[in-house]
């Protein structure tokens, strides 16, 4: 028997074909959300308060200090928040200390600081009753970046940018004349020496002493001449910089000094953040810059005078490691003192080394390091700026390397906690201005923290972030996989990120550093491709927000692959050689082969095994969760695998889902961590279990109660239904499944079913990927899903009186009211169809437009028939189903309602949707299609044992798509069905073709895994043997019921008077320019005319046509379309004299065009005729009277 059995949870055993021993289990898949939020509550929030506070008033006589904060219990439970459309949030109380510096008085007070949304255990937030997710954002990391560019003459120039977390950018660049310039905050450029002089190093010799004598430095000094001898060089430089930053304002050296301090050296205005300081120190550190260079001077220990490295030595990694302590200490440290006019006058410590120029052995180049400022220094220092300039000048000498902005060492993730902290900081900064003003204006004696703090800006900032930020998204809740995937999403869009239109190919493309950090496959098709990514299965964030991936360490001394796991970021990994997880190992852990496949800085090639530093932890660490659920991924083309990963997220939860026969072993972990299942929090014994709740007695005697959700509406309108898995007496351990969630079976994710599939054509019905299906799948509810829709009706106070919910509706038959209760609300369990009343409601009508009959009724019956309009909530088009639940909210019950609303009624309607022609189906390999025909079971082809096939797919869908994984799944699935087992074939470590054929033989199938099929209609065998097997097929959310739409009478656009478009608006079908050409080509003039008039925008014509149809009269001629009038008016507005003439060349007023054909309008001639006729009739009547009188006489 190939493979070995693996237990997944307590309910499933699978035969696994994996060969690689995994030393590290998968981490919790939603920890990117939960850990980040926990860190925010533990330290992030405190840091934000400490950043902004203390606040002093303008005279510095009072100070407000932050002491601490406390989160109290949330007002609502999770369930209550969902029901009441409230947010799941906890009140936050902050303790402040107000110090009066004049009197020494200190007042300490706890201030309510608003309700703060709390993350649920599932990594989501409940905001206004809806479940939302904060998507992590992938942004460019703060730090210093160097780049090169080639101009049109082929000359290479260099550039550099210091990007802070917040604050002004500092840029350097060279031009075609080899002069180096700087730009401050995207303004006009100035020679870089001007900035050096402003920093207090004003002499040309000083500049050459710091940076060394290079062509760039000399050229720039020549360009930067002393223009005004009345000013010192430093003052002149300061004024020049001020003129660039504030053009048109009077320039003085003092104002320029304070401006530059505020721009770069004030921690409240300029913040590199911890990550920016880390990146800056890493880039400008002398150790990385000396690597590979030849030293041009003896390196002497400043304390002992011992020569550590002799001149002419190449600085290899071993040499640098041997003197690392000295490099981190005081080796070659020089102190420079700026002059008294400088922006910052403190002494500057630099580390300076002389190396041999790589491109000219006779020249010496100076390398300046920033001497590693402390990690807590968040603003720039003078040393940082000088070291950056040195690196930039060294690039022209061939020392140092330019940065790749798409490298994941230069992109970091802002997770929930950081995004929230940033919002909170914005709110506090707005509050700070407010507080400072109040402290200065009000009477100092009586002030308390409560009086001067206005929390509105803070609560508004948080509310705005959760409600309307691009990164706060409505959770994708189609199924557990889509939930999980959404929580692990990384978006490069959003505030401070990229925009779709400006993102080029490079940013979107797969980069070698994505390996093990971001999935190269799972990303949307369309405009967001490559901008929205997913975290790989093992990926996690370090404290700076860089993505790490785990590797097994190789002991270089013994050559053994150890079980020690090391997590590396992308730039750390660049220093090592990493072998693949499937490298063959001996029993003792050494490499079995001399040469192994490995990666180093993006180069995949063979390396001698003794050079390897690390080995991958698992083959699936490359891909994301959804991709890791595709069996035989290694046999699929990546484009189709992308579709497969994305379509699994669109699977609809079925009534009775089944886990796949052929899985990857990822199904258990994905279901467990998704948050959709009920998981045991502690060990214990089940003492009570039914469909609604499970009680577990812990070992310490306390009771855990787990509620089971039944048929709750998910965000996407599917049924969120959990099923209990345990019974009384069961022993459960922490982490065990207590109940399956939607799309789960036996503690595993189950997005679809395992039908018997044949690759064959049948009467052409599976042309173009269409799917032919057996009626069994409809009758047995195999692909039936439940969908819940929510409808609500509210009563408000209007000007004419309050609206009412009632049974007493005007002009409504008793038949229509039969399912309403005495209040006028539909009963639970009623079957409703389109147009049925769900909530009877009347609204008072204005008295002004009463007809004569109504006035008469008023006079007879008094005020009883006071006019009301029927504004009942009715079932909309396509909303048929069974009433599942009704919820009533009123002020009397203590429910919080919007102002002006007296009562709110919510009705939930459940629909049971069987699969039908037009629904979309898919496999896991990107093989999607639409159901084209549902064939009676007896007509379907059948196997030799009489089993009819369930689904027929077109074999032509395989070769050109190159997703061969589906064929392998098909055969292995049939073998699993025959053997009655479940199989796990993990990605990149799954069943080989030998394993597949061994299992096929074990199952007693034919050697080619094909079979003879018989035609269900004739009983004759088909000519050729057919591939038949079991394939996992899912039903997708794109259902025909949601798409099919037809319009008879509907709304029109106000401006164009044409029908609206789209199903949601009950719109019409667009008949565009090319469709008009088609009718013209056929000469179908009458059809064309009615399409352009009655059916579109001939306002009067369509009214008359409708009237004629209802009265059964012939349809009158059409009038003038509204668009013709619009066109005429448009041309007139351009100053063209446009007139409409009739056939006799008389001018016609546009408004008269319709009236001429109106039956109700009479002309003067007609009036004359009518008078004559009337007179004639009157005369005849008179004559008849006289004759009658005569007779009687």
Swiss-Prot record:
Pfam families: RNA_pol_Rpb2_1 (PF04563), RNA_pol_Rpb2_2 (PF04561), RNA_pol_Rpb2_3 (PF04565), RNA_pol_Rpb2_45 (PF10385), RNA_pol_Rpb2_6 (PF00562), RNA_pol_Rpb2_7 (PF04560). Gene3D superfamilies: 2.40.50.100, 2.40.50.150, 3.90.1100.10, DNA-directed RNA polymerase, beta subunit, external 1 domain, DNA-directed RNA polymerase, subunit 2, domain 6, RNA polymerase alpha subunit dimerisation domain, RNA polymerase Rpb2, domain 2. Keywords: DNA-directed RNA polymerase, Nucleotidyltransferase, Transcription, Transferase. Residues 1173-1193 are annotated as: Disordered. InterPro entries: DNA-dir_RNA_pol_bsu_ext_1_sf (IPR042107), DNA-dir_RNA_pol_bsu_external_1 (IPR019462), DNA-dir_RNA_pol_su2 (IPR015712), DNA-dir_RNAP_su2_dom (IPR007120), DNA-dir_RNAP_su2_hyb_sf (IPR037033), RNA_pol_bsu_bac (IPR010243), RNA_pol_bsu_CS (IPR007121), RNA_pol_bsu_protrusion (IPR007644). Its EC number is 2.7.7.6. It is an enzyme of class 2 (transferase). It catalyses: RNA(n) + a ribonucleoside 5'-triphosphate = RNA(n+1) + diphosphate. Residues 1177-1193 have a biased composition (Basic and acidic residues). SUPFAM superfamilies: beta and beta-prime subunits of DNA dependent RNA-polymerase. One of its GO terms (cellular component) is DNA-directed RNA polymerase complex. One of its GO terms (molecular function) is DNA binding. One of its GO terms (biological process) is DNA-templated transcription. CDD domains: RNA_pol_B_RPB2. NCBIfam families: PRK00405.1, rpoB. Belongs to the RNA polymerase beta chain family. DNA-dependent RNA polymerase catalyzes the transcription of DNA into RNA using the four ribonucleoside triphosphates as substrates. The RNAP catalytic core consists of 2 alpha, 1 beta, 1 beta' and 1 omega subunit. When a sigma factor is associated with the core the holoenzyme is formed, which can initiate transcription. This is DNA-directed RNA polymerase subunit beta. It comes from Streptococcus thermophilus (strain ATCC BAA-250 / LMG 18311). The gene is rpoB.
């Amino acid at each position: 028997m190939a493979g070995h059995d693996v237990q997944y949870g307590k309910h499933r055993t699978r035969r696994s074909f994996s060969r690689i021993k995994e030393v590290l289990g998968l981490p919790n898949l939603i920890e990117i959300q939960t850990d980040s939020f926990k860190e925010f509550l533990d330290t992030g929030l405190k840091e934000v308060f400490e950043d902004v506070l203390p606040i002093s008033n303008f005279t510095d006589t009072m100070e407000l200090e932050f002491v601490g904060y406390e989160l109290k219990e949330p007002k609502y439970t999770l369930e209550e928040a969902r029901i009441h459309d409230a947010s799941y949030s906890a009140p936050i109380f902050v303790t402040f200390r107000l110090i009066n510096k004049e009197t020494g008085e200190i007042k300490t007070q706890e201030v309510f600081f608003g309700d703060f949304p709390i993350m649920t255990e599932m990594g989501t937030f409940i905001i206004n009753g809806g479940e939302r997710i904060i998507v992590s954002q992938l942004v460019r990391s703060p730090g210093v970046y160097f780049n090169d560019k080639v101009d049109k003459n082929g000359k290479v120039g260099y550039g550099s940018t210091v990007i802070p977390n917040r604050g002004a950018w500092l840029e350097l660049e060279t031009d075609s004349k080899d002069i180096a310039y700087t730009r401050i905050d995207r303004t006009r450029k100035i020679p870089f020496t001007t900035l050096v002089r402003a920093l207090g190093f004003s002499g040309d010799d000083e500049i050459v002493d710091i940076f060394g004598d290079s062509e760039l430095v000399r050229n720039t000094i020549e360009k930067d001449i002393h223009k005004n001898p009345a000013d010192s060089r430093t003052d002149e430089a300061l004024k020049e910089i001020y003129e660039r930053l504030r053009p048109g304002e009077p320039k003085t050296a003092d104002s320029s000094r304070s401006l530059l301090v505020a721009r770069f050296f004030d921690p409240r205005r300029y913040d590199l953040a911890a990550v920016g300081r880390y990146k800056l120190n890493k880039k400008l550190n002398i150790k990385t810059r000396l690597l590979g260079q030849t030293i041009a001077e003896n390196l002497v220990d400043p304390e002992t005078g011992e020569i550590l490295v002799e001149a002419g030595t190449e600085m290899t990694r071993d040499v640098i490691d041997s003197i690392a302590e000295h490099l981190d200490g005081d080796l070659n440290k020089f102190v420079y003192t700026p002059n008294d006019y400088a922006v910052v006058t403190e002494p500057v410590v630099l580390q300076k080394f002389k190396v041999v120029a790589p491109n000219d052995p006779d020249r010496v180049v100076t390398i300046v390091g920033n001497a590693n400022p402390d990690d807590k220094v968040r603003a720039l220092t003078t040393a940082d700026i000088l070291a950056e300039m040195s690196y930039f000048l060294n690039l022209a000498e061939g020392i140092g390397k330019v940065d790749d902005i798409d490298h994941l060492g230069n992109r970091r993730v802002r997770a929930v906690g950081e995004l929230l902290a940033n919002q909170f900081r914005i709110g506090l900064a707005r509050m700070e201005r407010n507080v400072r003003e109040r402290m200065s204006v009000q009477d100092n004696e009586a002030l308390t923290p409560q009086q001067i703090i206005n929390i509105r800006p803070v609560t508004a900032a948080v509310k705005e972030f959760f409600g309307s930020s691009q990164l706060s998204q409505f959770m994708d809740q189609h199924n557990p996989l889509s939930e999980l995937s959404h929580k692990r999403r990384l978006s490069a869009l959003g505030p401070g990120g990229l925009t779709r239109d400006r993102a080029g190919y490079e940013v979107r493309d797969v980069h070698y550093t994505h390996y093990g950090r971001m999935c190269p496959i799972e990303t949307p098709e369309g405009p967001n491709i490559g901008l929205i990514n997913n975290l790989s299965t093992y990926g996690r964030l370090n404290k700076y927000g860089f993505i790490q991936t785990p590797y097994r360490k190789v002991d270089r001394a013994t050559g053994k692959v150890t079980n020690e796991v090391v997590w590396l970021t992308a730039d750390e990994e660049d220093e090592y050689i990493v072998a693949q997880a499937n490298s063959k190992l001996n029993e003792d852990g050494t490499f079995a082969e001399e040469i192994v496949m490995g990666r180093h800085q993006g180069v995949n090639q063979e390396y001698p095994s003794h050079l390897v530093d690390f080995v991958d932890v698992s083959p699936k660490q490359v891909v994301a969760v959804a991709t890791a659920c595709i069996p035989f991924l290694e046999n699929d083309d990546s484009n189709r695998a992308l579709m497969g990963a994305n379509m699994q997220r669109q699977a609809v939860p079925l009534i009775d889902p089944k886990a796949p026969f052929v899985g990857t072993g990822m199904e258990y972990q994905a279901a467990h961590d998704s948050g959709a299942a009920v998981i045991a929090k502690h060990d214990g014994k089940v003492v009570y279990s039914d469909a609604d709740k499970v009680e577990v007695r812990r070992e310490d005697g306390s009771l855990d109660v787990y509620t089971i959700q039944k048929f709750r509406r998910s965000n996407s309108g599917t049924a969120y239904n959990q099923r209990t898995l345990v019974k009384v007496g069961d022993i459960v351990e922490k982490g065990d499944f207590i109940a399956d969630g939607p799309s789960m079976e036996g503690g595993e994710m189950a997005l679809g079913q395992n039908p018997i599939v044949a690759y064959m054509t049948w009467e052409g019905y599976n042309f173009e990927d269409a799917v032919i299906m057996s009626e069994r799948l409809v009758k047995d509810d195999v692909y039936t899903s439940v969908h819940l829709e929510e409808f609500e009706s509210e009563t408000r106070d209007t000007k004419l009186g309050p609206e009412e919910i009632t049974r007493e509706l005007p002009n409504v038959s008793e038949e229509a009211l039969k399912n309403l209760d005495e209040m006028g609300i539909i009963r639970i369990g009623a079957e409703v169809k389109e147009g049925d009343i769900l909530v009877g409601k009347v609204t008072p009508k204005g008295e002004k437009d009463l007809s004569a009959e109504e006035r008469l009724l008023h006079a007879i019956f008094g005020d009883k028939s006071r006019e009301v309009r029927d504004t009942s909530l009715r079932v909309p088009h396509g909303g048929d189903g069974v009433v599942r639940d009704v919820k009533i909210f009123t002020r009397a019950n203590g429910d919080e309602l919007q102002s002006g609303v007296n009562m709110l009624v919510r009705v939930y309607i459940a629909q049971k949707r069987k699969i039908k022609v037009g629904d979309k189906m898919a496999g896991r390999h990107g093989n999607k299609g639409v159901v084209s025909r549902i064939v009676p079971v007896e007509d379907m082809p059948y196997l030799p044992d009489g089993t009819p096939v369930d689904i027929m797919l077109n074999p032509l869908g395989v070769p050109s798509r190159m997703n061969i994984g589906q064929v392998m799944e098909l055969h292995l699935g049939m073998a699993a069905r025959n053997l009655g087992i479940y199989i796990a074939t993990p990605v990149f470590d799954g069943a080989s073709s030998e394993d597949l054929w061994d299992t096929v033989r074990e199952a007693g199938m034919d050697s080619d895994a094909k079979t003879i099929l018989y035609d269900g209609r004739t009983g004759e065998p088909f000519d050729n043997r057919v591939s038949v097997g079991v394939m996992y097929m899912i039903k997708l959310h794109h259902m025909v019921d949601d798409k099919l739409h037809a319009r008879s009478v509907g709304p029109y656009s106000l401006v164009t008077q044409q029908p609206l478009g789209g199903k949601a608006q009950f719109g019409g079908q667009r008949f565009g320019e090319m469709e008009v050409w088609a009718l013209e080509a056929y000469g179908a003039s009458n059809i064309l005319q009615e399409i352009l008039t009655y059916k579109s925008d001939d306002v009067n014509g369509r009214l008359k046509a409708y009237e004629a149809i209802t009265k059964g009269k012939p349809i009158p001629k059409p009038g003038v379309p509204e668009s013709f009038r619009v066109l005429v008016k448009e041309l007139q507005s351009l100053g063209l004299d446009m007139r409409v003439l009739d056939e006799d060349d008389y001018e016609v007023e546009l408004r008269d065009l319709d009236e001429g054909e109106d039956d109700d309008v009479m002309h003067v001639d007609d009036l004359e005729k009518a008078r004559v006729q009337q007179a004639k009739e009157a005369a005849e009547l008179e004559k008849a009277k006289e004759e009658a009188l005569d007779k009687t006489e």
